[in-house]
Amino acid sequence: MSDLRRKGWWNVPDYFHSPLVFDMEEDKEDYIFGPHDEYLHTLEVHSNTLIQLERWFTPTGQTRVTVVGPLKARLWVMDMIRKVGSKNNLDQIKGKMMLLQIRDHPLRDRDLELHPESGSSLWITTMNDTTFVEVPHFSRFPLTVAWLFCGFVRILGIHNFADLHW
């Protein structure tokens, strides 16, 4: 992560392709980014991402959140937000710990390593050139699906779980 800061990750065009985009309730936004976005800049600097908040974007008053930056950093931010908003108490605690961590100090390389957890709500399995993702029906936040194809990473955003058939 320190290499990204020294080299200026914002100078790499690939980090701006396929941004992570999702809608968030106002109370979750205030909890994560602070009142009047007090923690927004700190979260951006510590995660090497750029986060754009568009308030009242949806008819229901939700905020549209767009995150760009290195893929692993975007996935970490997504995981933190998903866990903070989870109905599962253990995931909520993990999410709150991640939130406190990112407010306190920059992410390290070991923070960005993917560790499949037993009972995790996101399972990724690779078979041949296809990646399958299984998502539980109780997820509250949108999911971004990433897969590697011929050396290129492609991101798919699912913005509304209600559109999916379980």
UniProtKB/Swiss-Prot annotation:
Transmembrane stretches in the record are none
Instruction: Name the InterPro entries for this protein.
Output: KH_dom_type_1_sf (IPR036612), MOEP19_KH-like (IPR031952)
Instruction: Report keywords, A-Z.
Output: RNA-binding
* Entry keyword annotation includes Membrane: no
> Where does the record place the KH domain?
19-78
* Coiled coil spans: none
Residues making up the signal peptide according to the UniProt record: none
Extract one GO molecular function annotation from the record: RNA binding
- Source superkingdom: Eukaryota
Q: Record keywords: RNA-binding included?
A: yes
Q: Family per UniProt?
A: Belongs to the KHDC1 family.
- State the name under which the record lists this protein: KH homology domain-containing protein 1C
- Organism annotation: Mus musculus (Mouse)
Could you read off the lineage of the organism from its UniProt record? Eukaryota, Metazoa, Chordata, Craniata, Vertebrata
User: Which gene codes for it?
Assistant: Khdc1c
